[in-house]
């Protein structure tokens, strides 16, 4: 029996995986058609991309990374050289994957019981910091599970159960299709991943 090919999806960190999985499914990929790997930072992701960018393979390899304030066009030009393999795809979250999370303001509002008008904008830099501050300012006893102030009290970091709560939020409330109209980079990613899936399905 022929074993179906599985797309390899690479992202920067473990906390990105729930969102990336949801985006893949929204683009038409079933859970058995892809696997998401966290590479431990942007430098490692770029290294893996350089190793594979020109290697032909029937297996789709999808790289999803943050722009972190850099110009996405210049970033793509630097990382995706001419002659890139047809099954290598780079999608850039502008500015961070947390921008995609915040783009579904309705889902975010419901999950965290925040007035819709108080959900911070997905646009602009430091989306992660702004998202965590938004939740921390609720002042509830369980907000530290998702967001916490740093030891120096000069910023915000992930809470002790951030990944668990993020996965629950993504499963219960977050919808890529609803977020896409408020995030151009997410909208383009969904379109490109749908096209890749159609090609992948035809090849199978």
List each model region and its residues.
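Early extracytoplasmic/lumenal segment of secretory-pathway proteins
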Residues: 38
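Short hydrophobic beta-strand that contains or immediately precedes a catalytic carboxylate
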Residues: 9-12
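C-terminal accessory helical subdomains adjacent to catalytic cores in phosphodiester-
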Residues: 1-6, 17-35, 43-62, 67-204
């Amino acid at each position: 029996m022929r074993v179906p090919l599985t797309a390899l999806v690479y992202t920067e960190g473990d906390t990105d995986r729930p969102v990336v999985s949801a985006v893949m499914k929204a683009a038409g990929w079933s859970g058995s058609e892809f696997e998401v790997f966290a590479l431990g930072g942007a430098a490692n992701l770029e290294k893996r991309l350089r190793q594979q960018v020109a290697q032909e393979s029937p297996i789709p390899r999808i790289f999803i990374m943050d722009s972190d304030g850099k110009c996405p066009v210049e970033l793509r030009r630097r990382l995706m050289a001419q002659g890139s393999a047809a099954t290598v795809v780079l999608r850039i979250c502008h500015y961070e994957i947390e921008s995609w999370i915040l783009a579904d303001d309705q889902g975010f509002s419901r999950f965290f019981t925040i007035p819709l008008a108080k959900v911070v904008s997905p646009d602009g830099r430091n989306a992660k910091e702004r998202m965590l501050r938004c939740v921390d300012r609720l002042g509830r006893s369980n907000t530290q599970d998702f967001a916490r102030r740093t030891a120096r009290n000069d910023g915000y970091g992930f809470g002790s159960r951030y990944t668990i709560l993020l996965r629950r939020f993504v499963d219960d409330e977050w919808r890529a299709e609803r977020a896409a109209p408020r995030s151009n980079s997410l909208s383009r990613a969904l379109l490109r991943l749908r096209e890749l899936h159609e090609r992948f399905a035809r090849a199978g």
